[in-house]
């Protein structure tokens, strides 16, 4: 209900702790950190994060972000134990200190917050940020780590458990038909497996959802970000002073999603959830949600996506290098039709589109229900004569001319009007494509659905092999019937075909029915 949703603002601002002077062995050593990378594991985990805000940063910000990313990816994929600093009589664990370089401390803290929210696979990171100075007086910063994740062995067990759950959930998401279906399944999985609670050990982290099924808005949003990015749906997290939610890019436009406020469950209602805050605009808000969904002012430096629509618009821009492919491509159709593409790219619209452009057209893949390249090729002899087996050219012709000309692009499963002209000679008097492939299955198998290559075979080989090209001309009969031709051509079989084409038919000579001389 509204009253309950209004209270679901459990995001906690980072606790920034000045730990003073750092020991020499606490200063960063990035070459060593990067050498500890498990490349395969790092590649696996990278897909759960987002580089959207990273792409908006300055060079110095990117340098610090990358160093902090490397330290935490090493911590995630390795089994070293966390470092710690003692402050106020308590140990504060961290994943490793990194120099902030030329950045001021406030900017470095903003970058660190973005890194944590953009990489929820770093589930071990808590709400603390530690900073200190090295012997040169330069600032170093580290992300805090939950006490229960500080031991390398115990953390490895947690990581493995999270990986197994993510693999299962992502497989369920990828099994859905369309991009919107996949996004909704990511939303619903969280609804089915998590309860809003501030009592969990990891309630500010994706680990709250993945390990305990208990989290606040930060855990909901960061888990949704993980699941969507894993299947190729670009998703980021954004915060107000006390709330965290998502922005999702679908069909080229951004939409706001708030899984936390869609979750209406309490101890009595079980699995009740809705879609009130699912794919809406920034302005979709009531009195209490305006302040909850207003991004903190510091986000303005990083181009937070703007969400303008309250309903998903599935028509997107399929322009690439000056060509509009929308008449031959729809991403949902492509992913639904080809499981191998979906397995490779999930719901990543851009990768699926680029596959279609770079590979799919050449392979003859169907990108939209209203255009089948084989049907288009089968139906139009003029195009086959122009393009042959260059399948890509048929798509481009339909885009540039065919659709406007009203040409039909579906429904023709076979060639019904095969070409009969080869090197300027019309062989229709002695050849018919449909007859030839029906009579000679070996030819049909050698040149499937290819009337041009089939005619070429007839001209260069078939005539010499005395193959019959249509029902009106049998070279054996023509040979048997006409002594003048036998005297002129002997066993030069192709000459009989050419004679009939050039003279015999016009002279009224008969091309069938004579079984012997």
Where are the regions a protein language model picked out?
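Catalytic cysteine-centered active-site loop
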Residues: 197-207, 214, 235-242
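N-terminal accessory/pre-domain segments preceding catalytic cores
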Residues: 1-177, 290-322
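Hydrophobic/aromatic-rich core segments of domains that either
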Residues: 219-286
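Secreted/periplasmic proteins that engage bacterial cell-wall peptidoglycan
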Residues: 188-198, 218-229
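Secondary-structure boundary elements
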Residues: 154-209
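Repeated polar recognition positions within modular binding domains
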Residues: 99, 191-201, 212-213, 262, ...
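Charge-rich, low-complexity intrinsically disordered regions
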Residues: 320-517
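A short, highly charged nucleic-acid-interacting micro-segment common to nuclease
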Residues: 104, 206-220
